């Protein structure tokens, strides 16, 4: 009987093999489940091979498949995977032990499974034993393995359905909580939007208040600047007025000085004219003297010859020249005396020119000062008008600002109150959201736990399903083997029937020979004058077949009392019973439907063989032994009744050989066959499909 090892296989490198069976049926796919330890990175170059137990090298594998790489792996948790070995590559059935080995890409063995075999299933492998304690007495039940697997599968399916219902309920709760959270988030978003709008309004009012305050400050600053400018302009006007007065006084003094200088200049001009006249006169005299000197020199040149004559005249002339030289020196001295006067006159003229220029400049400056004063007065008037306008505007702005400030304070109070209410509402919503998030987190953790448990149960169910499929495959293989054996038994049965027909012919031939010998013996006895009733002899002569018994035997029976009494019992020592035909007993009234009731034919053959005697049974079924003889002996009474009447009896019930359940004889034969197939859980489709 095939047994599965549900315990984890020992591993060298941490790889564990799960649900490794002790035996596998050949010509069927083998599914290998294994678990990679945490921290192991699976690779597409890793492979799982089927090795002989004594194999010492990784190259001594019988077959292998590449390992499957999971799409998602979780750090810190083991990784489950499975591979399938195709039926065409599996070893032949035998006593050789094999094992799975996980080999990584470096060629190192990371894990191996317990040993197992490949062999054909035995008939007893289809049954399992269950021990139950009921009322203190131990009961040993033998049931088909398919039934146990079906019950386990039903329980797993029921548990899976319960978990799925629980999962659906949790998902509904999570959906409701999410909808509640979304509603609260929408309300929170609305409150936040209102709060943001109020904040924007508050910021706008604060901004407008700040702008008004800045404008007021700017206007106040401008007013201060204008007042300072007015004061500065007034100071400048006063300073300009003082400067104008000083300039006027200085101008008067300069005018007086200019007048004095003009008079002095006129006086100096008069003196200069006199000096010039004197100079001109002196120059004229000097010119005259020079002309005279030239004339005298000429005369002196003319008179050189007469020098002696005119010595006295020359001396006189020398004196006159000396006198003229003295006069010329005096004139030159007077001219030299006139030079400082010329310089003084020139300085006075320059001073007068500079005074005139200064006076012109002072006039121009005075004119510009007067224009500046006029402009300053106009600007002062305009500034006073602007200051008055600014003061009026400032008063209006102050009044508007006071009104805005009152309205702002009211709005600020209302906004603060609404903000406080919104804050309280937001705090409540935050607390509600935190509580809901905590609830959702708990639900998520619980859902994750249920999902993990469901995944674990699903993996277990898948493993059990694969095990059940494997068991079902083995059952199908066993059923195919049974069908082959049944076909072989049918062939043997046909051969046995053929042999029985031949044996029947032989038995009829032997019976005819014995009957002929008996008839000859009786004729001899009749001839010898044996005493017999005449009526009896006449009846025997008329119908000798009436002496035949309804039952038949192949040999003489020691106990003659078991046979019915005959008319010749007192005179005959040996009774030869004419055997009834075996073929009619086997075929019965429904000979055409013998192929449809094969089990009844086998029972009829066995009962006929047993009723005819142990020697005949040994001749007919030498290879079956005494087991079938004992089973068939239980039907001896019905067989004898059939033999006594000469008509095969139809059984009133059809009985299942496994559970002994009875079916009416007139019921359809398919009902019994379907009932028997139900014990083996045989179906062409998979019984369960897990989604």
Swiss-Prot record:
It is found in: Cytoplasm; Nucleus. Residues 515-604 are annotated as: Disordered. A zinc finger (UBZ1-type) spans 653-679. GO terms for biological process: nuclear receptor-mediated steroid hormone signaling pathway; positive regulation of DNA-templated transcription; positive regulation of gene expression; positive regulation of transcription by RNA polymerase II; signal transduction; Wnt signaling pathway. Zn(2+) binds at residues 656, 659, 675, 679. Residues 1-190 are annotated as: N-terminal AD (CTNNB1 binding site). The modification Phosphoserine is found at residue 4. GO terms for molecular function: beta-catenin binding; chromatin binding; RNA polymerase II cis-regulatory region sequence-specific DNA binding; sequence-specific DNA binding; transcription coactivator activity; transcription coregulator activity; zinc ion binding. Residues 1-30 are annotated as: p300 KIX-binding. Pfam families: CALCOCO1 (PF07888), SKICH (PF17751), Zn-C2H2_12 (PF18112). Residues 145-205, 232-339, 417-514 form a coiled coil. Belongs to the CALCOCO family. Part of a calphoglin complex consisting of CALCOCO1, PPA1 and PGM. Interacts with the bHLH-PAS domains of GRIP1, AHR and ARNT. Interacts with CTNNB1 via both its N- and C-terminal regions. Interacts with EP300. Interacts with CCAR1 (via N-terminus) and GATA1. Functions as a coactivator for aryl hydrocarbon and nuclear receptors (NR). Recruited to promoters through its contact with the N-terminal basic helix-loop-helix-Per-Arnt-Sim (PAS) domain of transcription factors or coactivators, such as NCOA2. During ER-activation acts synergistically in combination with other NCOA2-binding proteins, such as EP300, CREBBP and CARM1. Involved in the transcriptional activation of target genes in the Wnt/CTNNB1 pathway. Functions as a secondary coactivator in LEF1-mediated transcriptional activation via its interaction with CTNNB1. Seems to enhance inorganic pyrophosphatase thus activating phosphogluomutase (PMG). Probably functions as a component of the calphoglin complex, which is involved in linking cellular metabolism (phosphate and glucose metabolism) with other core functions including protein synthesis and degradation, calcium signaling and cell growth. This is Calcium-binding and coiled-coil domain-containing protein 1. It comes from Rattus norvegicus. The lineage of its organism: Eukaryota, Metazoa, Chordata, Craniata, Vertebrata.
